[in-house]
Amino acid sequence: MSNRTFQRGDPIGHAFADPALLAQALRHRSAGTPHNERLEFLGDGIVNLLIAEALYHRWPKADEGALTRARAELVREGALAVIGRTLNLGERLTLGPGELKSGGHRRDSILADAVEAIVAAIYLDCGFERCRAVVLPWFEASLAALPVGKAEKDPKTRLQEWLQARQLPLPTYALISESGDEHAKQFHVACILEQPVARAEGQGTSRRLAEQQAATLVIAQLDSNT
């Protein structure tokens, strides 16, 4: 197949004219340069655009809030990591010795970043139209599973709306600790309510994920008391 990098049955579904793009997309910063962080940055924007466009056309009657929640659900770290596993990225990543030893090829954050980097690599290799044609099928099952126009609100939003409906003070999110290397951060956050009095702690690979987990646990406390 000319000089393109492609293996029959490759779940990525694209034959790279420039093999260096794919190699860089799969190279974690722990393995040295050129790594995939710049590609990840570009890919994040492209994925958000692709999903926003798909939802806009599929849900013609959905309001902005429903579209935003649906996009957030589809592009969250965990959802992208599932795609990364479907594409068998874990076994193809180039990792440094430390990440190899700690099981970085299984970590959601690394897999999600690699998915975004590969999206950018495809875009740079062949343009937006081809990128859309290759990437959207990765999300098809998740898109089809979403109730039309009724994507579930994230825990922080649900908690905020529960409190606002009762005219109660909004929660406070406090960072307890931040640990780990730059490429493998762990955040420990507390969600604190004044009224009703409640507190829960969450952890995650980003502060947002830790806050969402803490909010989920506070909601569970509120549900158990009603």
From Swiss-Prot:
Reactions catalysed, as given in the entry: Endonucleolytic cleavage to 5'-phosphomonoester
Domain of life: Bacteria
Keyword check for Hydrolase: yes
Domain (DRBM): residue spans on this chain: 154-224
Domain RNase III, residue spans: 5-127
UniProt enzyme class: hydrolase
Annotated localization: Cytoplasm
SMART domains: DSRM, RIBOc
Record key words, sorted: Cytoplasm, Endonuclease, Hydrolase, Magnesium, Metal-binding, mRNA processing, Nuclease, RNA-binding, rRNA processing, rRNA-binding, tRNA processing
Cofactor(s) essential for the protein: Mg(2+)
Active site per database record: 44, 116
Alphabetical GO biological process terms: mRNA processing; regulation of gene expression; rRNA processing; tRNA processing
Main location: cytoplasm
E.C. code: 3.1.26.3
GO molecular function, one term: double-stranded RNA binding
One Gene Ontology cellular component: cytoplasm
Signal sequence residues: none
Binding-site residues, Mg(2+): 40, 113, 116
Family label: Belongs to the ribonuclease III family.
NCBIfam families found in the cross-reference section: RNaseIII (TIGR02191)
Task performed by this protein: Digests double-stranded RNA. Involved in the processing of primary rRNA transcript to yield the immediate precursors to the large and small rRNAs (23S and 16S). Processes some mRNAs, and tRNAs when they are encoded in the rRNA operon. Processes pre-crRNA and tracrRNA of type II CRISPR loci if present in the organism.
Subunit structure: Homodimer.
Protein name: Ribonuclease 3
Organism the protein comes from: Xanthomonas axonopodis pv. citri (strain 306)
Lineage of origin: Bacteria, Pseudomonadati, Pseudomonadota, Gammaproteobacteria, Lysobacterales
